[in-house]
């Protein structure tokens, strides 16, 4: 068993987030990402952050944004987070919760397209 380099608090927060997923994240996880041939992890620690969904083979982070992300301070935090993730070689794509709830097929298609592009298929 590999030893984690993440703080116990971060790991506990990730577990809690996996248990209490918002409706859009739950829908994308169970009805969308599970249909793809690529392996995704949900609520995955990366550095000091917990990303919504992570595909290791493509080094892709998928983030879902609810209404709280409309706030200027939240947008600034998202920008810093994205810059950090970019700096460690990860690409970040974002979707609004509304898009997942109203156009799941389109969101999943785009995620699959980006994964395939990044892994060269």
Language-model features, listed with the residues they occupy:
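Nucleic-acid endo/exonuclease domains
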Residues: 1-121
């Amino acid at each position: 068993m590999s030893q984690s380099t993440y703080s116990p608090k971060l790991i506990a927060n990730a577990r809690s987030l996996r248990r209490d997923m918002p409706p859009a994240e739950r829908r994308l996880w169970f009805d969308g990402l599970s249909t793809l041939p690529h392996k995704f992890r949900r609520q995955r620690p990366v550095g000091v952050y917990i990303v919504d969904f992570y595909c290791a083979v493509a080094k892709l982070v998928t983030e879902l944004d609810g209404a709280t992300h409309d706030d200027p301070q939240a947008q600034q935090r998202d920008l810093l987070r994205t810059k950090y993730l970019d700096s460690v070689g990860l690409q970040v794509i974002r979707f609004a919760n509304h898009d997942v709830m109203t156009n799941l097929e389109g969101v999943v298609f785009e995620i699959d397209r980006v994964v395939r592009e990044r892994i060269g298929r």
